[in-house]
Structures are given as C-alpha cells and as structure tokens.
C-alpha cells in the first residue's frame, strides 16, 4: 500500500519538491525543541533527519539541523513560521545540492559473522574510510562519515554479510571556504 503524502508535499505550479537542510539557532532551554518539532508535525511537514546540540554554553545557544522535503513555497513557509517562534534567533536554508555546503551523516554499524564474511565486510568498509571502533573474532563495529546515500548503499551491501545493528545521526552541514553561517 503506498504511503500517504502530506498535503504540503504535493507538487504545485510553484515548483517541485526538493530536499532542504534547515539550520535553526535557538535558546538552549526546556521545550524549545518540542516547539520547533511541533511546528513541523502540526502542519504535516515531514522531518527526514534531525541533529541538535548546544553550540555556545555562555550564550546558551543550540543549533538544530533539520532535513525536510518540500516545494519552494513550503520551505519558505517553514522558514517564516520558524522565525516567529520566540526562542529562535536565526533560520538558514540550504538545498542538498548546494555546492557551497558540506553535508555529512555519521553511522555506527555492527557486523557479526564468520571470518570470511567479516573480512569481506571490512574490505568494503575501507572503501568508505570507515574507522573500526571495536572488533572481536566474530564481530566488529565501524564508524562511517558520509553522505546519506553513501551510508544507505553501504548498509544495503553489508546486510548479507552480517550487519545486525545500525545507529545514525541526522545530517549536519557546514559552509565551505571562509563563508560562515552562524547565529
């Protein structure tokens, strides 16, 4: 059965859907994340990934990085609505295809199996510059930092080799060169 789409994700005459990374600088206080997420869920916007961390202890600031999908008018509406929330200091939006922005995700992958399969899996992980964090005779845990689609591909390839557990962060983003987007 096909997954129902949100009314906000339907193509319109104003443009087609595209993935966007929305970065929001907020006060680091109780309830702020719930308000930001509530804005998305209350309007039927989907969040594909989410990463949140305090970035300035003195100023009590946190940075929320949200990956979502929508038409240009939906993304504009999301940004406007986020900007109206009291604890929000700044909102930035980047297309996933923006060549000026670096996007990465981190994944921890656990593989368990016989020696031959483990050796094959380790060789495969080296192609992704994976870092082995833990290993035994029957298993290993690897850390991979890459684009979402690259991690998806690695996960699919490792499944038949004994992949038993996956833990992933949401996307994080940073401008290239000396350009900075900050609070």
Label the model's feature ranges.
Residues 1-62, 69-183:
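Long, contiguous binding/interaction regions
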């Amino acid at each position: 059965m096909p997954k129902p789409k949100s009314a906000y994700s339907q193509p319109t005459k104003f443009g087609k859907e595209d993935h966007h990374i929305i970065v929001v600088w907020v006060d680091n206080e109780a309830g702020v994340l719930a308000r930001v997420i509530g804005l998305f869920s209350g309007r039927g916007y989907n969040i594909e990934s989410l990463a949140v961390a305090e970035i300035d202890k003195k100023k009590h600031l946190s940075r929320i990085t949200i990956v979502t999908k929508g038409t240009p008018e939906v993304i504009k509406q999301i940004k406007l609505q986020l900007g109206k929330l009291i604890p929000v200091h700044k909102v930035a939006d980047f297309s996933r295809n923006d060549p000026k922005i670096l996007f990465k995700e981190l994944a921890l992958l656990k593989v368990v199996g016989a020696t031959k399969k483990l050796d094959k899996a380790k060789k495969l992980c080296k192609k992704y510059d994976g870092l082995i964090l833990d290993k035994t005779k029957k298993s290993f845990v690897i850390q991979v930092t890459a684009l979402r689609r690259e991690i998806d591909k690695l996960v699919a390839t490792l499944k038949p080799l004994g992949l038993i557990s996956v833990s992933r962060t949401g996307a994080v983003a940073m401008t290239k060169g000396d350009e900075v987007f900050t609070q």
